[in-house]
Amino acid sequence: MSSQAETSQKEDDLKTSGQLGDDIASLFCTSNFDGSDRDYLPEGCLDNLITAENVKCELDKFTEGLHCLKTEDSRRRNRETYTDDFRQELGRWIQNNAPRTFATMVHCDLGPLHLLMSMQKCRDTNFNDQSLPILAPNSMPESWNASIWPRHKLRDFYDKQWKFLAPVFSKYEYHYDCQKNCIFPFTKENVPPRYGAFSTVYKVTVHAKHQKHDSMQAVAIKEIQIIRGDRKTQYDCDVTWDNEARALKSINDIGHDHIVKCIAAIRRGDSRYFMFPWADGDSLRDHWDGVPKRDPDAFTIQEAITQLRGLADALDCLHDCKNRDEIAMETKWKLKTSSQTHLMCKYKMSMTRFPAP
């Protein structure tokens, strides 16, 4: 059973154990895209866990932490402040506004009293899921209590927040600007990467809950080799990547069957990526090498003419593209499976050359 199917099964069978942190961890999936395994929570899983009822059950445990307070007067004031109605109302606010923030704090093992106090501060200052991520491990939000969030706890929150912030790729969005520690919800397929002069292409599967494209199975992630150098070199590389992303977006707008669309242009820290559909048929050269030679017949001749006419029309459309001056097309073609035939597509186009590393 795949990890995605296992997650769905766990969600269907889930009955909270009373240990919310364990219940959340049981739904984690693993991304292997970055060379080492990184856990993330699939989109939508918190909907079944961070309910007002479950949150209140966690907040009700605050009395377990009252013994840490030095005086009986302090313990009494906390009981009077954090009434049942107060915790119920706070639970509803957390469910509607800060489920990711709450889940991250649960995984930081704050203790129930500090968890309650921290979420109260978040509500009072409107620190919610839209405030995530905190951008540095030493960047404590102004409203947070420094005694509850010493440096090591703040670092823990910074590291664990990414588990709940994996991006969702929508057909209505093209540009994605992610923080450097963002976890991609990808599983690398057992296919050797394809290395080019300025890029590496990986075959990956995007978790089903992190993509909103019709019938998108495997995708190609093209990682651009960005030169690490002085500020001007970095700036030039950024401009080059921006130009390529813009040109690919213009090509998408052509909407030609023989031109594979770029699904997404992704920044992650200093790294740059493009996402394309995976071409199942591989390159035309590989196709010829792998298919036994045979004498042409009427069907193959007609199919070849149809494909060549489609490619010629695609090239004509590219010539008329408003960004055609930025396009430097390469002579590599891809075969994309369509029903029981193959559709030849212009797949690999380099908009602008990246300097050699």
Regions found by a protein language model. Give the residues of each.
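Conserved hydrophobic/aromatic residues on the N-lobe beta-strands of protein kinase domains
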Residues: A220, Y273-M275
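The N-lobe alphaC helix and its flanking beta3-alphaC-beta4 segment of protein kinase-like domains
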Residues: Q225-D257
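Catalytic-loop of the protein kinase fold
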Residues: L318-A356
